[in-house]
């Protein structure tokens, strides 16, 4: 992808650009183009490292499968993103990059001026955090129901609500999203705390 980006910018804009797929703040702050591999649901949560983005930077969100991420109510840190499927033809990818770069050149607001309290990133409710923590540990619905003193039906209801909120469609996608949340250590801080409390018990 980085080689393709370099070729596109030289051919279309006669520019040499800085590209990063490293999610460290110093790398993000220097990059003209940020390449992110997105798992299902990940587009809806906060990514604090993106707050370091410089003005007019472009994000390429790379995804797999037929389920394209939606542009509705994206978190502010994903401003100026274009979605690219890994199986798309190179010609289409080039066009997307061209139009995305042209569009982000007109941005006038610096990323650090975005107000996080106005952001529409999604989080888990306290009860969903508890259910998600147990699923992340590998507990079955019956076990979760017993531990939380709720019915199995209620456990499945919370699970469906989580999956609906983040537009995910399988247990694998749910586990992958929870893994991303834990790695980011920001979207649901109580998720990590709940896991620590469970380990102490």
Predicted segments — roles?
Residues 135-139, 178:
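Short helix-to-turn junction characteristic of helix-turn-helix DNA-binding domains
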